[in-house]
Structure formats: C-alpha cells, structure tokens
Design a protein with these regions (language model features):
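Mature extracytoplasmic/periplasmic domains
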Residues: 256, 265-319
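Early extracytoplasmic/lumenal segment of secretory-pathway proteins
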Residues: 20-21, 35-103
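A bilobed periplasmic-binding-protein/Venus flytrap-type ligand-binding module shared by bacterial periplasmic
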Residues: 144-151, 187, 259-270, 289-290
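A ligand-binding cleft/hinge motif common to bilobed small-molecule-binding domains
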Residues: 102-106, 227-245, 294
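Periplasmic-binding protein-like
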Residues: 141-142, 201-204, 211, 242-266, ...
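An extracytoplasmic/periplasmic, membrane-proximal ligand-sensing/linker region
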Residues: 198, 298-341
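C-terminal motif of bacterial Sec signal peptides marking the signal peptidase cleavage site
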Residues: 15-18
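Extracytoplasmic ligand-binding site segments that recognize negatively charged/polar headgroups
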Residues: 42, 46-53, 75-76, 91-225
Length: 341
C-alpha cells in the first residue's frame, strides 16, 4: 500500500523564534504557558492525504507552534506500525484516527489507549463514544446502495435489490478481506435476524462480484459494468455531484455505519497537544471541516453536505462491539469460504 509521511506545522521563522531562547517550552513534547501549545505531535491516520492535510492545516491555524507529523496509510498498515512500535517498546504515535470502532476496541484491549473525556463529547451521540473514553467517532460514513441511473429503471428502497432475480450478475461489493468498512459491514449484517449469513449466500447465488475496495466497486457502477453496489455514501455523493450517472439510496432496513474514531495513545510525549487536537476534531469548527470535505458530521447541530443524510435521519444497523471485535477473523474466514476469495 502507498505510505506517506507528511510534516506540517509552523513555518521556519516560527521554529527559529521558538528555539531562540533557553526555555524548555521549545522542546518536543512541551506546552508553552505564554505562547500556547508547542512541540511535536505524531498523528497516525488512514484518512486520504488531502483530508489529513486539511485537518492539520486547520488545527495549526489555532496552534501554530505545534508541528504535526502525519503518517498515513491503510488502516491495517497503520495498526501494524503501531503494534510493531509497541513491540519495540516505543510507540511514536500520539493521536490515532482510523476506520472503525472495532479496530479501536482491539487497541483498547491491549492497553494502548489513554482515556480522555473531551468537553466536546457533550455534542457527540453517546452511541459513538467509548464508555471508557479511550476513543470517539469523528464522522459518519454509511454503506449504501450505489445505483447506476442509466441502467436502473427506478431507484430501489431495499437491500433486496441486490438479491432479486432481475439483478442477477448486476451487483458488486468490496471484500471484507481488504476493506475495513466491508469487514465491519459483514459483522453487522450477519448479526441481524433479518439478514445473517443467508443474505451473503443470496448475494453469492445472485452473482454478486467482489473487489478489493469501495472505490473499485463504485467505479464499476459508474462505468455501467454493474447496476448496483454496496459502497460508502460519501464517495457516491461526490461522484454524483461531479456528474456521474449514479445515485445513492439509504435502504429502508437500515445501514451500517463506521465513524473513523480518534483516540490518544498511552504515554504520549505531548499530552496537552494531543488533547487539543482531539478537541479540535470534535469541535463545531472541526466538524464543519468534515462536512466541507464531504462527510456527514458526527456532531449534532452540524449539517451534512448536500446529498447525504445526517445521523439523525439514518436508520443505523449495529451489533455489540465485543461480538464484532471477537468475531472479525471468523467473519473473514466465513466470507472467504463462501465467496472463494
């Protein structure tokens, strides 16, 4: 996978000014009392580069003396890096923001997260906050039906559109073996009485294609290779806004959602800056930025971008986190056996 390391933060002149004195405030991991927060902050994320850059730039407008180092990759590689560093006895990350709560539950079980009860949590729905305050969701990304409007006679309102005889060989979805969102979806769908593994068997029997990621699934729908796709909502809305012949449907049975949680790594070198960064992401300003980037904000009172539903408008499908976490590898094995991936 593509890996990038971006270094953002203060301009060279500010860094020189910060280093000109003998105060310890200029050292990495420090927080200056008079000049505000300072030092370095290592931010590990699975966000796209452009989103991570926009977030850090906005944070630095409030805290220009904090130099934010960003490591960006897919969720699996980000977590792999954290675990490798932990094994070596020195986790470099201060703040982590990756795909889903199941991933954070695993880190929590390994005692890698530091609890932090941000004041901004008052405006975040309780369902998306860890009761122990080791992580909280930052946005809402629902998996929806992507529909090619040139091929479909009308927009469906149910997930049954994927399993109807008329849709034979016309559906596509990302693989839980590669996509964190798809793995979460499999865990949620198979723990619903109205779906279960029978739903995935019907998908298989109806000729549903499987590709690695959401982007590839949407591309097939955009190109007219498939009529329907199981895809995260924001990329469908973006494609529609750009003129692609696609639309998105939130099926009446409900939708699984991932929330790209954020959390602080235990024994961070710059706790105050880490807390400030988390506060910013969850704040009204940070959530408006998420909306501007095309995501449904998780904070109440902040409008979703055009074409997407707000969290209050969604019928959310969910399952117990402990079951999703403990069952993820079994879910992947079951999927692999069923689809022959």
């Amino acid at each position: 996978m593509k890996k990038t390391m971006l270094t953002m933060g203060v301009a060279a002149s500010l860094m020189l000014a910060a280093c000109s004195g003998t105060d310890a405030e200029s050292e990495a991991g420090s927080s200056g009392e008079e000049g505000g927060l300072s030092g370095t902050l290592d931010f590990y994320t699975s966000q796209p580069d452009t989103d991570a850059t926009a977030l850090v730039n906005a944070f630095n407008e409030q805290h220009p003396k904090v130099e934010v180092n960003v490591f960006r990759s897919g969720t699996e590689e980000v977590i792999g890096k954290v675990l490798a560093e932990e094994q070596a006895g020195d986790v470099q990350a201060d703040v982590l923001l990756v795909a889903d709560s199941v991933t954070f539950e695993g880190l929590k079980e390994q005692d890698l997260l530091e609890p932090y009860e941000s004041e901004e949590l008052d405006a975040i729905p309780e369902d998306f906050i860890d009761p122990d305050h080791t992580y909280a969701g930052t946005k809402v990304m629902a998996t929806v039906l992507a529909v090619n409007t040139d091929k479909a006679e009308q927009l469906p309102d149910s997930w049954n559109a994927l399993t109807d005889a008329d849709s034979k060989d016309e559906a596509i979805m990302p693989s839980p073996l590669y996509s964190g969102a798809a793995a979460y979806n499999a865990g949620v769908f198979t723990r619903q009485d109205s779906f279960g593994w029978d739903f995935y068997q019907l998908l298989k029997d109806n000729g549903t294609s499987v590709v690695q990621g959401n982007g590839a699934a949407l591309k097939a729908v955009q190109a007219g290779e498939k009529t329907y796709g199981m895809v995260v909502d924001y990329i469908v809305a973006n494609a529609k806004a750009e003129g692609s012949p696609v639309d998105l449907v939130y099926p009446e049975e409900g939708v699984p959602v991932i929330t790209e949680p954020i959390g602080m790594i235990k024994d961070t070198d710059n706790e105050e800056a880490a807390k400030a960064f988390i506060d910013f992401v969850l704040s009204e300003e940070g959530q408006k930025l998420a909306s501007d980037l095309g995501y449904t904000p998780i904070r109440t009172g902040v409008e979703a971008p055009e074409g997407l539903k707000s969290i209050d408008e969604m019928n959310v499908l969910s399952a117990p986190l402990d079951e999703l976490s403990s069952g993820r590898e079994d879910d992947k094995r079951e999927f692999k056996e069923l689809f022959g991936e």
